[in-house]
């Protein structure tokens, strides 16, 4: 966070990216030398106290080819389940971001009660990441759009770098997501 009164914790093993983030944000890095495990996070939460934990970790659909199936399931499914479990034990509120990609899009006009019918690995991993006890958890199923810090694979990046005068798209679609500036 750029706001000094907010504590922001993160994990990033890339030293160059860490330095850039530390320079621009009030961030403290969690030393995560081992794999993501319930034991590692239980130890971390035993040493620290939080009112809220917001899960901003996820492997996005545009990058799922860079990661193994095991890594995608660990980050998008298992990690939120671990934090959800810890929220009950450590009495913090947990905010978890999910995606409309838990649906195939075939039906349209989905509601919260609709069957999550994802068929691809990304959608299924995010769907499983929503299977939480929800005692202290709020799941926000939304999309983000904005400039990326390090890659240019997002919709906005594609749109801004296209040389075409006209692009194909939808005329009656509604975007209900958030920008990464919010």
Predicted regions and their residues:
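Glycine-rich NAD(P)-binding loop of the Rossmann-fold in SDR/ketoreductase-type enzymes
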Residues: 67, 71-82, 116, 120, ...
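N-terminal Rossmann-fold cofactor-binding loop
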Residues: 9-18, 33-35
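NAD(P)-dependent short-chain dehydrogenase/reductase
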Residues: 131-181
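Conserved catalytic-core motifs of eukaryotic protein kinase domains, centered on the activation segment
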Residues: 21, 63-70, 105-109, 151
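SDR active-site strand-loop-helix element
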Residues: 11, 53-57, 94-100, 104, ...
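Conserved Rossmann-fold NAD(P)-dependent oxidoreductase catalytic core, especially the SDR/UDP-sugar
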Residues: 81-117
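NAD(P)H-binding glycine-rich loop region in Rossmannoid oxidoreductase-like domains
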Residues: 32-75
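N-terminal Rossmann NAD(P)H-binding glycine-rich loop of SDR-like oxidoreductase domains
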Residues: 1-6
């Amino acid at each position: 966070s750029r706001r000094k009164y907010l504590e922001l914790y993160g994990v990033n093993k890339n030293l160059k990216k860490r330095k850039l983030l530390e320079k621009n944000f009030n961030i403290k890095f969690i030393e995560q030398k081992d794999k993501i495990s319930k034991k590692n996070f239980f130890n971390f939460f035993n040493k620290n106290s939080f009112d809220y934990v917001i899960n901003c970790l996820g492997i996005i659909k545009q990058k799922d080819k860079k990661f193994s199936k095991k890594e995608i399931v660990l980050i998008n499914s298992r990690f939120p389940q671990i934090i959800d479990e810890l929220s009950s034990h450590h009495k913090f509120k947990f905010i978890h971001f999910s995606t409309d990609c838990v649906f195939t899009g075939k039906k349209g006009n989905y509601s919260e009660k609709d069957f999550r019918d994802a068929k691809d690995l990304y959608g299924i991993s995010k769907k499983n990441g929503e299977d939480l006890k929800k005692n202290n958890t709020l799941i926000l199923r939304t999309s983000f759009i904005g400039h990326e810090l390090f890659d240019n694979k997002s919709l906005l990046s594609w749109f801004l770098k296209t040389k075409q005068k006209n692009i194909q798209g939808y005329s009656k679609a509604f975007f209900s997501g958030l920008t990464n500036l919010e």
